[in-house]
Structure formats: C-alpha cells, structure tokens
Amino acid sequence: MDGAILKAGATNVVRGVSAPLPELAYIYTHSDAVACVCETFDLLSNMIKGPGFVGENGEKPKLVVVMYPQGKSGAEIAAELGIDVPVKTMDELLAMGDSTKFREVAVTEDDACTLLYTSGTTGKPKGVVLSHGNLMQGLIYNEFSDQALEPIPGETLLSILPCWHVFERMAEYHALSRGAGLVYSSVKTFKKDLTRHRPHVLVAVPRLFESLYDGITGKLADSKGVKKLIVLIVRRASMALVDARRTLSNRRIMTTPEEGEAYLRRPAAVKALSTLKARVVQALATPIVAVGDKLVWSKVREGLGGRLKCLVSGGSQLAVNLDNFFEMVGLNIIVGYGLTETSPVICNRVIEDNIPGSVGKPPRDTEIVVRDVESGEVLGRMRHGHGKDTDMTTTGKIGVIYARGPQVMAGYYKGEEDTRKAFDSDGFFCTGDLGMVDPVTGALFLTGRAKDTIVLMNGENVEPQPIEEVLVASDLVDQVMLVGQDRKSIAALVVVSPAGLAARDALVSPVELAAWKAALPASPKEPTPDPELLAAASATLNGRPEVVEAVLAEVKRLIREAPCGFQAWEQVARVHLILEPFTMENGLMTQTLKIKRDVVATQYVREIEAMYGSR
C-alpha cells in the first residue's frame, strides 16, 4: 500500500493502530488527507463511533480501505457502520487494479513523499514532511559495510519494528532496493522466526537486543559444573581479545572528552607498552577463543538462525555492554543515529570502522556540527564521515548536535514557526541531542539531551514536563524530575514533602518531621541549613520499603488518573526519594527556577544507576 501510494504520486501519512483515537483524528484532519486506510474493521468502527475522519471544513473521505475486513465486503462495512463514503476491502481494491490502466505520474525529488507525525511532544504532534529526495539519500548512501556485507538478492531481513516508523521503513526500503526479502515478525513469534527464516540482517531498537542479551546470558549462567567453567573462561578470554583488537585498531571507547585528550597526550613509551600488551593478549587469547567459539559462541549464533551477518541498532543509544557482548559472540552490530526529521540517518557505523559506544560518522553529503549550548561556538565538525572524503575537526568538547544534508526535512507541515525554530541561520537542523566528536576515533558520541525529551530504549519519546506537573499536585511531592534516557522505562527523582509524609499514615514521626523541616531552606533562593542531615535522612527514607512503595503508588495513581491520558511507556516504574530540594543556591535550579536536568542527573548519577540496577 505504501509503495502504491507513492507510485501514484500521492503523499501518505502513516501512524500505528495503537495511537489514541483523538490523535488519529487530529492527524487525519491536520494533514488534509482525502482517504484513509485502516488495518482492521475494528479500528474503523472505533473511529466512526468516536472522533471520526473529518477534514478541516467537514469534508468526508473520498475512499476508505480496510485491509483485514473480517470476512465483510466494503459495502457491508459501510452499511453496518452507517457511513455514506466508498469503502473497499484490500481484495476489492486489488480487483479494481486489474481492470484499471495505470497512469504514469512524474515525481521529482522535491515532491512530498510522506508525512510523519512526531510522538511524545507537548501539545499537538508535528507533521514532518519528507520528500522523495530525502528518502533516496538514505537508500543510496546509507551502508552497513564498505565491502561485501550489504544485503544481496536472495537474502532476508527480519522486520519486527512498527513498519510506519521511519527507521524501520528506511531499513525495508534499503533491503528491497538491494533485492533482499522481508519477513514480518512480532514479539510473540520472534524467537521462532529467527530459526525458521534464518535472517541475514536484523534491524531493531536496543531494547530488543537487550532482550536477546538477557536470554542468552541467562542460559549461559544456568550452566552447571565443567560447562559453567568453560563458559566463564570463554567469556573472559573473548572480552580480553575484543579489548586487545580495539586497542590495536584504535577503536577504544572514549566516554569523556578528558579521557580522549589524555589518550592523545600519552607518552610514546606508554603507547608502545599498550600496543605490546595488546599484542601479547591477542596472541594468548586467540587460540582459547577459537576453541571457545566452537564450544559456545557458534551455538549462540545458530540459535539466532545461523546466518546473521549484521545487526543494525537504532532509535536510541546502544549500551556498551551490548556492543561488547555481540562482538564477543562474533556478530557484527552497527548503529545508526538520527531523527524522524532527518529521514532518519545522519550518522552511522560501518563494519570496517565500527567504533563501539559511538554512533559513527555521517554518510555522504552530510555535515554534522557540534555547538556550545550557550555561545553557539563550533566545538566539532564532521563531513563525509566514511571513506576518502572524511573532513573532521574537533575540540573534543560536548555540545548540541546540528545536521545538514539531503536527508533533512524541509520543514513541518503547517508549522512555519516550528520550522524556523528547528534550523539555524546556516540551514543546520538542531537535533536537541548532546554529543562530541571524539578526537581519537573521529566518531560522534552521544552524551545526553539538550532538550527535555527523554528517548527510551524502545525508541519512544517521553516529554517529562506534563507528567511532572501532574505529580507535583500531590501533597507527598514537592519537586520531581523524570529520568530514563536510553533505559527500558521511566524513573523519578522525587523531592518529598516531610509534612505530606507525616500526614500519610504516619510514614515519618513527629520528631523526624521537626528535624527535617528545620534543615530545609526557606525558599529556592536560600541555602540549605543542614544538607548533611537531609542526605542522611534521604538514605533512611529510601531504606524504608513502606515509604518508597507509598510514594511510588501515589505517583502511579496520579499518572493513571490524569485527564490527558498518558501512554503505557510514560508510566513511572521506580522512584528515589530526596529531602534536600533543588534550589538556585545548590546549583540545581536556574535563575528562572527551572530544574537543571543535566546537573541533577550528574549529582544523582549513583542513585539513578541504583534505581535501574546493572544494565
């Protein structure tokens, strides 16, 4: 259906069936759609009974297509739902095509191809207009490999992501353009599909790769006796070999600018010693890993179908432990980075230049600039990241990532002001992500978000402010900051109200209440009288399960009962309780009394890690 609409020269607007009905209705109206395609009869029925499909001036659809009509004809569906617009099933539509001569339509690279509405934003979704030229750039220049590991005719890509998502959609276009086939899977059938269809390429979000990792390592951990010892030796030897190879190929992970600078400034003797050590480790570990591969890793690969030559991750940051594990197993895993507005890839790793922990380098005709958050000073620049055309300069400092290239959208549909804000004076699109161009490897590393938006491991976006506004209405909560970037779920740092806790089933004693209130600042602009006491008291609170559970239950209730109706992925799964408030004086709030999210996240990094446990 997607290809047919584009072939006809029309523009399609895609959205998942799980989207709220009011959102679907808004998108239909805002996009000026003239027809609609519904996956199921039930979806169409719910829309007709609910908000309906109505144009801005009350226009009805010219055509409704139902892909899975539950045995009904189009006429029967129209009669049952009481709608006076043409309704066709997919089979009926195909039959119409048999007797209709196709008229060729001239399409240019600047013509609108698809309209994608961003999710998880405050207010109404924004419609991203992507042209044929935007998508063609990705088809031509996005590569898995500089050599022979690209999909070829006869090979298979296993698809498990929503097909309307720009990442999955471009992956499918990429495979089809190379003559490869597609297998559509689901969470329920994924494990069977791996062994049944034995794909060559798997494209997914980090959450799925983490599920694979958990399943595989869980089985390995269940090994007994000699087998358990063999697994332990093989894992340690494999990781040692991976580290040695990374050192020798200059693929070391640099997690901070300071680490990269220190690496570059190493004395010659230290460099030589590091190289010698890596060569010795490589020589010792290689035969052990060769045997271990036959005993352990080959069986892991066979359990994943036995033919996987490339894993492609995108949608959010890939955890380093996943990078490490799949490299140990002997599977190539690469990462793409971008947004809906950039079609989506503006940086990617290729197998021959696969820097772990990074998102790689820009494809052809793409420029990346890293600017200082406050001054706008250029801290790093990348162009034509792969191959002979590489052009990179960097200070190694962290800033906001901007992108310019043929894959970047022209703008938002009916959103002139949003479009103006999204681009700088040089035509670079602001991603809202923080990162640095690593001076050692020349790769782009993501370090966080300049905007408040939280991107979960499954690729879903969460805007924290609307949720936080709901939570501070509770008498238990004075302040709250949501966290969860590149995690499975949302968690919350909750500055609790001592008085609120005391009023709720005596969660704290009158003596504690009096002591804690005396240690609190009178206002956000004044210093905290006794931060040490509050820190100790916070530890006490977090050590009381009944208190933590009471606050978490309150948080979940408020989100569940919120009139705006939050999505499943916007639910808070964990909380950490804090007594010392975020203030200007302790550096955790701006002069306009906004929480400095990056500063708070840094100060409470241990508490955040403890909420999530080991990744």
PLM segments and residue spans:
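Conserved AMP-binding/adenylation subdomain of ANL enzymes
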Residues: 136-159, 163-273, 277-298, 307
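Structural core segment of the AMP-binding/adenylate-forming
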Residues: 7-92
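Conserved ATP-dependent adenylate/AMP-binding module captured primarily in the ANL superfamily
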Residues: 19-52, 138-157, 188-201, 303, ...
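Conserved AMP-binding A3 loop
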Residues: 113-139
